[in-house]
Every structure is written in C-alpha cells, then in structure tokens.
C-alpha cells in the first residue's frame, strides 16, 4: 500500500493501533468497546489516506506556490489532527477505567 510505504504518520498510527489492540486483548474489552476501537482506528486510517490523496493531487496540479494549495493541504492535515485528538480522548475514556483498575491490582 502506497501510504504505508511513503507516509511517516500512517506508520505511527499502525504502531498505536497494534498497541491498542494488544491492550484490548489484555483487558478483554466488551464487544461494543471493540466496535468503538475499530471505528476509531479505521477512521484514522481513512482520514490519513484522504489527507495523502489531497496533498498529492495539490502537488500534481501546481508546482508553484499558491495560497489556495497551501490552504487545501493545511485543511486536510488539520482534519487528521482533529480526528487524532478525538481518538486520544476516546482512548482515554475507553481504557482509563481498565488502566485504573489494573494499577489498583484488580485485573489479571
């Protein structure tokens, strides 16, 4: 897949996704929590792929600097950043109770 080979951010997201899936297996999260987790992980990948597509199309259309080209790239990157922030919040809500209970010593 082109994005995995070329985009540093997607590699980071793959790493985080693997960590989150590992934590989910360890904490034995519920089916609903799995659904939420996969929606968030999938959403992040989709946003990053769209961001990459927009950046590449902008680069294809113009080799010169243009304020609208910069705006298009910045807006696409901002969408990825906003979704990443929302993903962190969801992760804290999802895993916070499990981590707290684990630190107290009540989980396996």
Positions of PLM-derived features:
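Amphipathic, cytosolic membrane-interfacial segments at TM-TM junctions
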Residues: 58-75
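Hydrophobic alpha-helical transmembrane segments
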Residues: 2-50, 61, 65, 80-108
């Amino acid at each position: 897949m082109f994005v995995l080979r070329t985009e540093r951010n997607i590699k980071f997201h793959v790493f985080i996704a693997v960590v989150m899936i590992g934590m989910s297996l360890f904490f034995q999260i519920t089916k609903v929590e799995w659904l939420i987790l996969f929606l968030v992980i999938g959403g992040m990948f989709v946003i990053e792929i769209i961001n990459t597509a927009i950046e590449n199309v902008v680069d294809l259309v113009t080799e010169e600097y243009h304020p609208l080209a910069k705006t298009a790239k910045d807006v696409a990157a901002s969408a990825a950043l906003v979704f990443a922030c929302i993903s962190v919040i969801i992760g804290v809500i999802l895993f916070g109770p499990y981590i707290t209970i684990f630190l107290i010593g009540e989980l396996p």
